[in-house]
Amino acid sequence: MEDDAPVIYGLEFQARALAAQTAETDAIRFLVGTQSLRYDNQIHVIDFDDENNIINKNILLHHAGEIWQISASPADRNVLATCYNKISDSKVLTCAAVWRIPKELQGGNHESPDDTSSNAQALELLCHLDNTAHGNMACVTWEPLGDGKKLLSLADNYLMIWDLQESSTKSVLSSSVTLEGKGQLRFTSGKWSPHHNCTQVATANDTAIRGWDIRSMRQIYCIENAHGQLVRDLDFNPNKQYYLASCGDDCKVKFWDTRNIHEPVKTLEEHSHWVWSVRYNHSHDQLVLTGSSDSRVILSNMVSISSEPFGHLVDDEDLSDQEDNLQEEKTKEPLQDSVIATYEEHEDSVYAVEWSSADPWLFASLSYDGRLVINRVPRALKYNILL
């Protein structure tokens, strides 16, 4: 069973920001943000034509500065937020803003005329998330199942919830909490849980992971020394409400049950350098992607701690006698966790991996040299999960 070859797209600038266009569930579309100190930065809107295995792109100018993170609105496919650096009074500030893709490019079907981006249009600014009193922005993330009017941002040691008003042209700080403790505490990443009516978020600072209830803005759990070194990224299992994945500079990926935080449920040690990104598949949570500065992307099958530890079970009424026997064998014991594939198309640090929001079997990875690689889950595993 021949697997499709990876599709590679090169940007002319260095890049570390990648997001799937969350609200787009028909077209396979990714957003990539560049990091250039000398030139105008860009967001490349990447459309992947699955049938012909080709990439179409649109380039949008992001005049505000080099892009450190992109987060796509869950409700409006044409709205996104970025964290970016700007120079002010010879100091570097990391800021955040909400943008709209210009109307002419909203369908995603008008390819940019050339690679020079000389005719590229600029993103339309909707509003800034004003962090002048709170320090440098570390990340911005949208309320997962919301109407695209609520955002979480982390800046230094502040956790802030924002409401967007007046067609998203105005941001209002609705609540905030300060991380307090010894030394200079600083958030590095955060994730909004899709469970519990979206009332919980998880944050990372140094080697610790903390859970917060955003109704009371109080800490609800803290995993001290979750990793031996800095925690880089977090992701919630979309189908198991208490399960959380983390990765860090200790080269490890850990899986946690937030009801019992004394030790991880599972630990992966497949990477040989810092792990920057971890992502659960939105539909099949046993599939977990990780990207690392060892320049590799690893796809793991974490079936034993997934929502279907015994595989895909079928109702008894739908089975013949022969199938019944097979099904009995299948249900006797949980399936084994394993590394499915290691992807080595990158030659530089892989800072981001993302699953497509339109096709659960397809994902993208981005390395610092501006190389975007689109890959698929191996067919054999896909059919094994489905059948």
UniProtKB/Swiss-Prot annotation:
Principal subcellular localization: Golgi
GO biological process, one term: endocytic recycling
Keyword terms of this UniProt record: Golgi apparatus, Repeat, WD repeat
PROSITE patterns tied to this protein: WD_REPEATS_1, WD_REPEATS_2, WD_REPEATS_REGION
GO cellular component: Golgi apparatus
UniProt protein name: EARP-interacting protein homolog
Gene3D superfamilies xref list: YVTN repeat-like/Quinoprotein amine dehydrogenase
Subcellular location: Golgi apparatus, trans-Golgi network
WD repeat boundaries on the chain: 132-172, 182-222, 226-266, 270-310, 345-385
Highest taxon of source: Eukaryota
Gene, per the UniProt record: eipr1
Family assignment from sequence similarity: Belongs to the WD repeat EIPR1 family.
